[in-house]
């Protein structure tokens, strides 16, 4: 969903930066007993899109920047993509075994592939429209991927690739469910799309908060209503995750009322056919990103948002405060005991014990 203007580009600059390493010990009760926070690097940067690629944490950022942090070598590398005098903001990132893909949010939308081998950058998709605003991107496999954007007509803007990201095609509106007036998506943490096998879930916000489901990699769709708060421009589902094909969790709330903890989180046990509110007036208010803990049997969830980092060990009913730092926008797990969080001016490693 549009919140600021963007600028676009292409010129590559390789940079390395000094690593910062600050540690904080936070004791708490639950499935884990303690957590340490290691600051991997700090910079003047806004990061809402990250992914884990073996020993590297790749990121897309503001001011035409992307890069990675090598967890083994403890080194950061960063590049810029410039086009004319404009800049890009990358809020969507995805990968295949060979390439990283970065998608900018606003007009014109530019999608780049970046070779993991030599970091060569290639423009693979461009869309010009005053209403264009892309929110999230994922791959089903090494050949097929999908990205979702706000409606430019009366449906979500959905582009797909079937050739490993070499070419992308926008799905025709008559093949997609119609969005309600004022229904769009939020580019908060690259978690508007969740994929498990061939199953795909997209989440919406604004005047409506719904889940769009495809069982066949975006060929057909069904839409499900949810009880998440909705009705205003900045309400709805901001983030989603599925533990498996049946257990899922959605969260969000009201961005303008970030302390409101009601009607902002819900779960499913049937693959998204039905959703039930949970944790009413408990835990967090506005949620930017939620992720299931690997190996937690769908019971353990971590959230980053307006009240910091919080953890649930009972499926979202109760929440424990892990950190009061509110500057994180997104989080991904490396394994059960390690996660990476990023946001305003920093990237950190969370070590759960």
What are these regions (language model features)?
Residues 1-32:
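Bacterial Sec-dependent N-terminal signal peptides
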Residues 27-40, 63-83, 108-128, 158-177, ...:
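Asp-box/BNR beta-propeller loop motif
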Residues 39-64:
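Beta-strand-rich domains and repeat architectures in extracellular enzymes and scaffolds
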Residues 41-42, 84-88, 129-134, 177-187, ...:
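Short glycine-/Asp-/Thr-/Trp-enriched loop segments that recur within the blades
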Residues 46-49, 88-94, 131-138, 234-239, ...:
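Repeated scaffold domains used in trafficking and secretory/extracellular systems
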Residues 56-58, 99-101, 143-147, 199-201, ...:
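Entry beta-strands of beta-propeller and related beta-repeat scaffolds
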Residues 106-108, 151-155, 205-207, 257-261:
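Short, solvent-exposed loop/turn segments at conserved positions within beta-propeller repeat blades
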Residues 333-353:
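Blade-level signature of beta-propeller repeat domains, shared across WD40, Kelch, NHL, RCC1
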């Amino acid at each position: 969903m549009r919140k600021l203007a963007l600028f676009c580009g292409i010129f590559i600059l390789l940079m390395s930066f000094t690593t910062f390493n600050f540690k904080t010990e936070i004791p708490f009760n639950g499935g884990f007993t303690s957590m340490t926070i290691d600051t991997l690097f700090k910079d003047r940067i806004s990061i809402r899109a990250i992914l884990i690629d073996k020993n590297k944490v790749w990121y897309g950022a503001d001011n035409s920047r992307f890069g990675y942090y090598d967890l083994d070598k403890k080194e950061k590398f960063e590049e810029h993509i410039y086009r004319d005098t404009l800049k890009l903001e990358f809020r969507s990132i995805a990968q295949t075994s060979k390439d990283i893909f970065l998608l900018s949010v606003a007009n014109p939308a530019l999608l780049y592939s970046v070779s993991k081998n030599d970091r060569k950058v290639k423009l693979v998709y461009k869309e010009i429209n005053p209403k264009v605003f892309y929110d999230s991107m994922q791959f089903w496999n090494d050949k097929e991927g999908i990205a979702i954007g706000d409606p430019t007509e009366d449906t979500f803007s959905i582009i797909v690739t079937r050739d490993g990201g070499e070419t992308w095609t926008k799905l025709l509106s008559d093949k997609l469910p119609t969005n309600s007036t004022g229904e769009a998506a939020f580019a908060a943490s690259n978690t508007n799309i969740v994929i498990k096998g061939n199953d795909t879930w997209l989440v919406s916000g604004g005047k409506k908060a719904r889940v769009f489901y495809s069982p066949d990699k975006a060929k057909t769709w069904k839409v499900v209503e949810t009880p998440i708060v909705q009705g205003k421009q900045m309400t709805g589902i901001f983030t989603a995750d599925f533990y498996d094909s049946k257990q899922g969790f959605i969260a969000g709330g009201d961005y303008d009322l970030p302390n409101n903890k009601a009607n902002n989180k819900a779960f499913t046990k049937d693959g998204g056919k039905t959703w039930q509110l949970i944790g009413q007036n408990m835990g967090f208010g506005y949620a930017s990103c939620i992720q299931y803990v690997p190996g937690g049997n769908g019971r353990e969830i971590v959230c980053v948002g307006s009240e910091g980092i919080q953890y649930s060990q009972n499926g979202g009913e109760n929440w424990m405060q892990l950190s009061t730092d509110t500057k994180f926008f997104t989080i991904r797990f490396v394994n059960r005991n390690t996660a990476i969080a990023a946001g305003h001016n920093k990237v950190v490693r969370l070590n759960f014990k």
